[in-house]
Amino acid sequence: YQGPEAEPEAVLGALRKAGYRTVATARREDAVPLDELDLEAGPVALLFGTEISGLTPETIAGADGALWIPMHGFVESFNISVSVALCLQELTRRLRASEIEWTLPEEARKEIYLDWIRKSIKNVEALEARYTSERER
């Protein structure tokens, strides 16, 4: 996405305002290996760059922290889908093995599910209006 909402400062600010710590997946002096990311410090938003150019220097510098994915052999980088999968697998495994309360509250799950349903159904506004008018009769 190339709109103004994609500017690094706006993205990082919105994530922080929503209560997330931002962690760039990039080599930075303070970067930690994926398996050492502190999950006790609260909700985290991982930042991934494009396969060609990675994260912008502004995003890397502006993130609250950074992590790197350990690689072995002759590999210098993973493509984006592999990087995301490796991070999600490791962090999910660690969260499930921890005492951290990481699941979404029931109300938040319902909101996300309803949002997904609305985005999945054609003419959802018309269907909701019809349903509402029929209930009011």
Where are the regions a protein language model picked out?
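Post-transcriptional modification and biogenesis factors for structured RNAs
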Residues: 1-137
